[in-house]
Regions:
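N-terminal Rossmann-like FAD-binding beta1-loop-alpha1 element of flavoenzymes
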Residues: 9-36
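Generic recognition of long tandem-repeat/solenoid scaffolds
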Residues: 108-109, 149-151
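Short glycine-/acidic-enriched loop or helix-start segments at secondary-structure transitions
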Residues: 23-24, 46, 144
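Conserved N-terminal/central alpha/beta ligand/cofactor-binding core
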Residues: 39-132, 137
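Short, Lys/Arg-enriched N-terminal segments with co-localized hydrophobic residues
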Residues: 1-7
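Short hydrophobic core segments
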Residues: 12-14, 37, 139-140, 151
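A conserved short coil-to-beta-strand element within the FAD-binding core of flavoproteins
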Residues: 135-148
Length: 151
């Protein structure tokens, strides 16, 4: 096990998957100094295989159609989708230089059909925001003191 010297950060995100990278981005927009710790050798590793390697970004249907298509109680998704909806996802990628397309079933993919372009866009946005990412940095334990994570 390797002990990393971790710089001070207001926010530390564990994992550089899609959710981790977007959480880091959101925190950076709030002015936080953000550090991502990723155990793998590259960010977004699992994104490479989504959508058969093409990365299905979202669905372009209206939110009510999306909720209705969820077999079991779509209400659990209300708060997250009303906060950052599918249109916001598309706008985020377009604004950051990723061309997208909508296919059958309103599925949204990168125009290139390469998930690597999605990852590249996310990584570039994080760098632009000053987010630091440490690869090969597996988190195995959290140290708490007075109800706060201190290490």
């Amino acid at each position: 096990m390797r002990n990393w010297r971790i710089p001070m950060a207001n926010v530390i995100v564990i994992g550089a998957g899609a959710a981790g990278m977007m959480a880091a981005y959101a925190a950076s927009l709030c002015g936080h100094q953000v550090l991502i710790l990723e155990k793998n050798e590259k960010a977004g590793k699992k994104i490479y295989i989504t959508g058969k390697g093409r990365c299905n970004l979202t669905n372009a249907s209206d939110l009510e159609t999306i909720f209705a298509s969820i077999v079991h109680n779509g209400k659990f998704m209300y708060s997250s989708l009303y906060t950052f909806d599918n249109q916001a996802v598309m706008d985020f990628f377009i604004t950051n230089g990723l061309e997208i397309k909508t296919e059958r079933g309103n599925r949204v993919f990168p125009q290139s059909d390469h998930s690597s372009d999605v990852i590249r866009t996310l990584v570039q946005v994080l760098k632009k925001q000053g987010v630091e990412t440490r690869l090969h940095a597996e988190v195995t334990d959290l140290v708490q003191k007075d109800g706060k994570i201190t290490g």
